[in-house]
Regions:
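Ligand-binding pocket scaffold of soluble enzyme catalytic domains
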Residues: 460
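Beta1/beta-strand and adjacent pyrophosphate-binding region of the FAD-binding site
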Residues: 457
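…; additionally, a secondary subgroup of soluble metalloenzymes is captured
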Residues: 1-454, 463-613, 617-840
């Protein structure tokens, strides 16, 4: 029992024992409601004597013979016996009886009107436990009526933090079993079960001769579905459609959109879907009728199956309810089940981009080819990469195999087979090496005259389309100025030669034993590259990405301090692609490489006092998923001593076989080298032992030779951050009390990338009248446990008549920017005494 009630009882008991005359007071607590409380009761002028059913004779003897002077409260935690069985009846004739009407005490203490006291009396058993009673008090119900009392009792049983029937239903459905539900058993124990089902009818329109949670759940999901599916529902479902669809939609929306409860929603949805066999039902409907519905995952399964069929049929003009295929994919990925289906829709969107270019025709001339590649064709490589990136994350790929085969065929036999011969015809032109900047001129073009400290990140095998994704990522940062350009790599396009070309040099050469020298210095390792770099700029250094990525701030500054140029060698893509057992992970490596570089740039710009960055690569790559056949391989045998790779052969004499072209190393390196590099005109490879075969580089193609040059200038002291956001946890759509408490959650813990924010939270009418107090909250919690980021706000509403036809909103404003962050509509239903007609 709440402490204030107990104080009332103690005050009344103390009043019984005033005066000089000895007094005996009998208190028969029929239901032992106060038995727990008696341990804490101390009377000012009396002692407490505990009467037992079997010690009446001794009690009579004690009170009338042993201690005849002390005042006693004789407390009996059981009903008073009949006169014939009560051996203390004569003692009671000269004593007094004390009656503690718990229902009356509770009503007075809580401010419940007399006419609602019978509701308390009916459920008085609930208040026999102090913890339960305190939970009822903690709900802070302001205006009591029959419904509020019953909802409060149900809320307290469920340990809800707010007096809300929607919250009660949420807890019952998500925290309990559908059969043998522990909460329903507790409701029945306190005579609240019938009230629960009547409230379900009032709020959700659910009624049944034998109500059950299973059928309630089906009613909720079928009614919700009926509002968003444009087709007629199956006959067997129609009996479950409720007339209270608005309340049901608001309730299920709150579940599915809550970061805390969305997984519970998914489980309930899957349960109902299985029972109703919804996939079969939806499979018989037009896909146009399903676009707006996200009640069940089965909707997406039906849509995905249809989309795969359209793409395999190369029906890129298909329209679904006004949406093109990529528009539909984007829309569905943003809906509730997008967390589970988003990758599938991304895959389908990428496949669409590939299928759209199935009839690919290359242009002639190197400059037009490069211009077109930079403007559009790079996207074919990017979408192919994205397709497999998401494909590899699918739990089951069987149903996507026909689409995968189509994508693979388009990429290999339509795109690469057409583009690469045109490229290799163009690169033989006399002016080919003057169309775009050359990799061997990188230092002079980008670093020779720089005055500010610059970090150069060389990401091994970052081809142009991956660089374009990095560019797009950095462009999203408002404090970053980003530029993307391109340069033509050396040929053969492999690591040792590409890394050397990126260093400053007067001469670049390949020896007869195929060593690569810059200004006569062997530079196939970090020490050699640093020697070359420091010969041009003593205030420079070469470091490995893995050696600096986890350095503490002080250690990082030690690396950067007094340096003007820092070459950082990053090897994520090539490290995975160049090994036969990991080459199929190369597209994952591309994603990781972009993220690692973004993180490093942000970290150095904030902690390393360095704000100028250039990102480039030694070479690109070609990757095809299907295993190579013998027809994809070229013998490529050279009579001379040769440096052979799957995509190139360097030897004294050029190879003259069909499908092979060649170029002098002197032309590539800008010297008199007479050695020849031979390479496949197509995406085919030479027959060479060792290594993988699907991931290759070293040859002549846009994918291998067009490498990105990205320049980023960061604003000082800036790290890409976002504000810590807040969201509503409590499922509250109707305000029924002038004082209402709600639970919110800070969505993310404050960190290096999530900064604290201050919010103003209050309620508004549609006329912008503020109808509640305004709460301020500073979202600055660093707790990783989401439950510990939940906080409670108390709102006091204006005591006025609210128009049920008007819109009212809970609104959240960012205090710093003054911008509204979000709003949620609520119904104002402040119940006054004369308005009630609940009828239990």
């Amino acid at each position: 029992m709440a402490e204030l009630n107990l104080k009332q009882i103690i005050d009344r008991l103390n009043a019984e024992f005033t005066g000089e005359t000895r007094k005996l007071v009998f208190w028969y607590d029929d239901k032992a409601e106060f038995f727990e409380d008696m341990e804490t009761v101390e009377l000012q002028n009396a002692k407490i004597y505990y009467l037992q059913p079997d010690n009446q004779f001794y009690t009579k003897y004690f009170l009338e013979r042993v201690d005849k002077t002390t005042n006693y409260l004789i407390y009996a935690p059981f009903p008073k016996p009949d006169v014939r069985d009560n051996h203390l009846e004569d003692t009671m004739l000269y004593s007094r009886r004390f009656f503690a009407d718990r229902a009356s005490l509770l009503s007075v203490d809580l401010g419940i009107e007399e006419k609602y006291k019978p509701v308390i009396e009916k459920h008085i058993k609930f208040f026999a436990n102090k913890e339960r009673t305190q939970r009822f008090y903690d709900l802070e119900i302001e205006n009591f009526n029959e419904e509020n009392i019953l909802v409060g009792l149900l809320s307290a049983v469920c340990k809800a933090r707010t007096c809300s029937f929607e919250e009660v239903v949420r807890i019952v459905l998500t925290d309990g079993e559908l059969v043998d539900n522990a909460f329903l058993q507790e409701f029945e124990k306190y005579d609240l079960l019938s009230a629960f089902w009547q409230l379900c009818e009032q709020h959700f329109g659910y009624t049944d001769t034998k109500p059950s949670l299973e059928r309630l759940l089906v009613t909720l999901f079928v009614t919700y579905t009926g509002r968003y599916v444009q087709a007629e529902l199956p006959v067997a479902w129609k009996s479950f459609v409720s007339y209270k669809s608005g309340n049901i939609i608001a309730f299920l929306d709150s579940l599915m959109n809550s970061v805390l409860y969305r997984d519970k929603y998914d489980a309930l949805s899957a349960h109902v879907a299985k029972g109703l066999n919804v996939f079969s039902a939806f499979a018989g409907m037009r896909v146009d009728d399903l676009v707006e519905c996200d009640t069940f995952l089965a909707v997406d399964q039906v849509l995905v199956k249809w989309l795969v069929g359209r793409l395999v049929s190369e029906d890129i003009g298909a329209i679904v309810n006004g949406f093109t295929i990529p528009e539909l994919c984007e829309k569905r990925a943003k809906m509730h089940f997008g967390r589970k289906t988003g990758k599938t829709y991304q895959l389908l969107s990428s496949a669409y981009s590939m299928v759209k270019e199935a009839d690919y025709h290359a242009t002639d001339g190197l400059k037009p080819i490069i211009d077109r590649y930079l403007a559009a064709d790079y996207n074919m490589d990017q979408q192919y990469r994205k397709f497999y990136y998401y494909y590899d994350q699918l739990e089951s790929t069987e149903s996507f195999e026909p689409l995968r085969e189509l994508v693979e065929n388009i990429y290999t036999n339509e795109y690469l087979a057409c583009l690469l011969p045109a490229w290799n015809a163009g690169i033989q032109q006399d002016a080919a090496f003057s169309v775009i900047p050359l990799q061997r001129d990188f230092y002079n073009a980008n670093l020779r005259y720089t005055k500010e400290r610059t970090v150069v990140i060389i990401s091994d095998a970052m081809r142009y389309e991956v660089g374009q994704e990095l560019f797009a990522r950095m462009q999203d940062d408002p404090k970053c100025t980003a530029k993307l350009s391109v340069q033509l790599s050396v040929l053969p396009s492999y690591t040792r030669l590409g890394m050397a070309a990126l260093l400053p040099h007067k001469t670049l050469e390949m020896t007869d034993d195929f060593q690569v020298l810059a200004d006569g210095i062997l530079c196939d390792n970090l020490a050699g590259r640093q020697q070359v770099l420091q010969s041009y700029n003593p205030d420079s250094v070469c470091v490995q990405f893995d050696d600096i990525k986890n350095l503490k701030v002080a250690e990082l500054r030690d690396v950067l301090t007094k340096r003007q140029i820092i070459y950082v060698y990053h090897n994520q893509i090539d490290a995975r692609g160049d090994k036969a057992n990991t080459e199929d992970e190369v597209f994952n490596a591309c994603e990781e490489a972009v993220q690692e570089i973004v993180d490093l740039i942000h970290r150095i710009s904030v902690s390393g006092n360095t704000y100028h960055f250039i990102v480039t690569a030694d070479h690109g790559f070609i990757y095809k998923r299907d295993k190579l056949t013998e027809s994809d391989k070229i013998s490529g045998k050279s009579a001379d001593k040769a440096f052979a790779n799957r995509r190139f052969i360097v030897s004294k004499a050029a190879l003259g076989d069909d499908g092979i072209d060649h170029m002098s190393m002197g032309r590539i390196l800008g010297n008199e080298d007479s050695k020849m590099v031979s390479y496949p005109v197509s995406s085919n490879v030479f027959k060479v032992a060792g290594g993988g075969a699907n991931y290759v580089h070293g040859g002549s193609s846009p994918q291998e030779m067009l490498v990105p040059v990205l320049e980023f200038k960061m604003e000082r002291g800036h790290m890409e951050t976002k504000n810590a956001e807040i969201a509503l946890v409590s499922i509250v759509h109707k305000i029924t009390n002038l004082i209402t408490s709600m639970d919110f959650i800070q969505s993310d813990a404050v960190s290096d990338t999530v900064k604290a924010a201050k919010y103003r939270i209050f309620f508004l009418s549609e006329d912008n009248e503020k109808i509640s107090n305004e709460n301020s909250y500073v979202a600055d919690s660093r707790e990783e446990n989401a439950q510990k980021r939940i906080f409670r706000m108390r709102f006091t509403f204006k005591n006025k008549k609210y128009d049920k036809d008007k819109q009212y909103y809970l609104v959240v404003y960012d205090e710093e920017s003054g911008l509204e962050q979000w709003r949620q509509p609520v119904i104002m239903d402040i119940a006054f005494a004369d308005d009630i007609g609940f009828g239990f």
